């Protein structure tokens, strides 16, 4: 049974994680409540952080205050903390408290913009992994010109062996079935070429395993130049390559969006033309590729819902990370993945 407060889904928030915290977190919670809550779903927040910084914000953002419970934690995980240091020395941090809320059943999931390595280390220590999962991976849903796809790993595992890549493909396929509603997801390994001989030992080894796996619809290698075509449902990479690919794509999208706006709206004449002919269609395309609405990434394989928002997330980005958490909980994602894993086993 999901933790609830007055029948609301409960989300724990690490209010001190991220470049613009706690303002981005409290504003983000408010933006979510005002704009992103689906009909019929009610959400309540457990907020953890420094009272001196957060209390004035809760007074200002009354809707958040009215739909939350706040607990003071003066310690927080810093951006440059190594995972091992955070695990040993940030025991009274807002991040750890939010994760423990999930472990203790006070919340159904948590969201943080904090240090990725620390968040993974603390989450794995407190929550553990799902049955038969060796290493969790970070997964996010990315847009293409045709459809969305799941990309993993995005930084949890910089170096991956053959077995890890194989399991990421398996978990990614399950994630796509549940989150993307794809019956038989097509899975590909990210590589520097499509020939079987290309890539490092881990990638080539994973290729051999996936090629013979009866429960994965494996389509071989995919190059970075092809991922926006929308022909694949799941793309698998080690955490180093996946993270670089995602951030490069997001930076490109942001730059492209800014350039379009700059060129389209640099005079009253073009403003009029765009307004008359292109505004609705242009906005639809720009929103589809806007990184802010794709901010959330899930730590897939943990025994609990943990969502990572970008460290530089603003209120809108953080709000969409909250929405990702709520959707994952509402879909009962982890229990469905456990069921899928058991069927494979």
Curated annotation (Swiss-Prot):
Principal localisation: cytoplasm
Domain of life assignment: Bacteria
Gene from which the chain derives: plsX
Name of the molecule in the record: Phosphate acyltransferase
Swiss-Prot/TrEMBL catalytic activity: a fatty acyl-[ACP] + phosphate = an acyl phosphate + holo-[ACP]
Gene Ontology terms for molecular function: phosphate:acyl-[acyl carrier protein] acyltransferase activity
PANTHER family in UniProt: FATTY ACID/PHOSPHOLIPID SYNTHESIS PROTEIN PLSX, PHOSPHATE ACYLTRANSFERASE
Pfam families in alphabetical order: FA_synthesis
Pathway(s) served: Lipid metabolism; phospholipid metabolism
GO biological process, one term: phospholipid biosynthetic process
Known function: Catalyzes the reversible formation of acyl-phosphate (acyl-PO(4)) from acyl-[acyl-carrier-protein] (acyl-ACP). This enzyme utilizes acyl-ACP as fatty acyl donor, but not acyl-CoA.
Tagged with keyword Lipid metabolism: yes
Entry's family note: Belongs to the PlsX family.
Organism name: Wolbachia sp. subsp. Brugia malayi (strain TRS)
UniProtKB keywords: Cytoplasm, Lipid biosynthesis, Lipid metabolism, Phospholipid biosynthesis, Phospholipid metabolism, Transferase
Enzyme Commission identifier(s): 2.3.1.274
GO CC terms in record: cytoplasm
Localization per record: Cytoplasm
InterPro entries associated with the record: FA_synthesis, Phospholipid_synth_PlsX-like
Binding partners and assembly: Homodimer. Probably interacts with PlsY.
């Amino acid at each position: 049974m999901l933790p609830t407060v007055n029948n609301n889904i409960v989300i724990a928030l690490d209010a001190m994680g991220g470049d613009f915290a706690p303002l981005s977190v409290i504003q983000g919670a408010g933006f979510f409540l005002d704009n992103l809550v689906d009909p019929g779903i009610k959400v309540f927040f457990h907020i953890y952080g420094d009272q001196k910084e957060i209390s004035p914000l809760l007074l200002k953002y009354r809707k958040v205050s009215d739909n939350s419970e706040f607990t003071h934690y003066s310690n927080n995980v810093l951006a440059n903390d190594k995972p091992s240091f955070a695990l040993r020395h940030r025991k009274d941090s807002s991040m750890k408290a939010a994760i423990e809320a999930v472990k203790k059943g006070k919340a159904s999931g948590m969201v943080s913009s904090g240090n990725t390595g620390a968040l993974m280390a603390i989450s794995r220590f407190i929550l553990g992994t799902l049955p038969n999962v060796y290493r969790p991976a970070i997964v996010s849903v990315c847009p293409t010109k045709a459809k969305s796809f799941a990309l993993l790993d995005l930084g949890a595992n910089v170096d991956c062996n053959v077995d890890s890549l194989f399991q990421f493909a398996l978990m990614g396929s399950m994630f796509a079935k549940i989150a993307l509603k794809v019956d038989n997801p097509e899975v590909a390994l990210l590589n520097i070429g499509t020939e079987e001989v290309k890539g490092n030992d881990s990638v080539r080894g994973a290729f051999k395993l996936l090629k013979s796996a009866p429960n994965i619809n494996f389509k071989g290698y995919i190059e970075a130049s092809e991922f926006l075509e929308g022909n694949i449902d799941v793309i698998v990479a080690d955490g180093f390559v996946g993270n670089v690919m995602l951030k490069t794509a997001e930076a490109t999208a942001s730059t492209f969006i800014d350039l379009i706006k700059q060129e389209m709206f640099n005079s009253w004449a073009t403003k009029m033309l765009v307004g008359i002919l292109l505004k609705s269609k242009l906005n639809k395309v720009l929103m589809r590729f806007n990184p802010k609405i794709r901010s959330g990434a899930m730590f897939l394989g943990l025994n609990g819902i943990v969502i990572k928002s970008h460290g530089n997330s603003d209120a809108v980005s953080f709000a969409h990370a909250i929405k990702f958490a709520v959707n994952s909980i509402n879909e009962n994602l982890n229990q469905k993945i456990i069921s899928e894993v058991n069927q494979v086993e």
